[in-house]
């Protein structure tokens, strides 16, 4: 009985223990080596193998969930490709407009960032009103939008006429050193007329013709130290030839002008090189005063005699107007005659007392 009871109890307890074993297995998983289990196992991700610097393993499902969200934002659903349409209107300042599809007559929103090939001459991306363009239709937040906008067959778009053009850069304008202009009109004539040693201008047959040949600058240029004229002196009205300093090689026979005081005539007219220089006003030589007429000299003597020695004489250098002098000549002549008679009488009266005194003695 005891053996049978033990057998029965053992038989009843074994199935219960076996039933409890699978229930307790999940919460306590034992690590098993790959060699122990015959089933192949998937390789662990690199993030789990490497782990974080703190020793904790990085969570695996987080990157998988974020990747689809970023892909949805980056890529929009394409509804149609290579669709032709006509620009309904486009605002250059705001940077958006609408394109009317030729196939479905539907208005599609277009932004300036969707323009793939812009006009290279335009500064801003834009499409012109009524222009035919080719684009892709994608699904946007508020409806259909245009993407990859180009001209027909992938050519650049024409752009709006209200869009600003790019600045035209002239060749050599910014790279040119600041200094005097290359040549003046007056210098061209002098350089063409004169002859210099060792300078033979190359023949330009067939290279330029007509007006272009006239506008072409000569090959020879004087040294920089002799071309220090600012460029804004080109349009002034004074004679530019007087400011040109002759080249030493040009001072040959036939080119040297008349010598005045050991200096060529052309160098006497040269102005100061400083554009802000203003020469001081120099008073010229005193003009020779004309000799006074006989009548005027007598008139002055009579005036001094009438005024007496105590009265100051008239201010030296005083000149009467020319018209007044001409009008007063006949009057002066009459007065001179009267004064001359008085002057003649005075000396005759003076010697009379002298004779009387001599006789009395």
From Swiss-Prot:
Function: Binds to the GM-CSF promoter. Seems to act as a repressor. Also binds to full-length mRNA and to short RNA sequences containing the consensus site 5'-UCCAUCA-3'. May have a role in translation repression.
Residue segments, region Disordered: 1-74, 173-361
Modified residues (N-acetylserine): 2
Primary localisation category: cytoplasm
Biased composition (Polar residues): 303-313
Protein name as it appears in the record: Y-box-binding protein 3
GO biological process: apoptotic process; cellular hyperosmotic response; cellular response to tumor necrosis factor; ectopic germ cell programmed cell death; fertilization; in utero embryonic development; male gonad development; negative regulation of apoptotic process
Parts forming coiled coils: none
Disulfide bonds: none
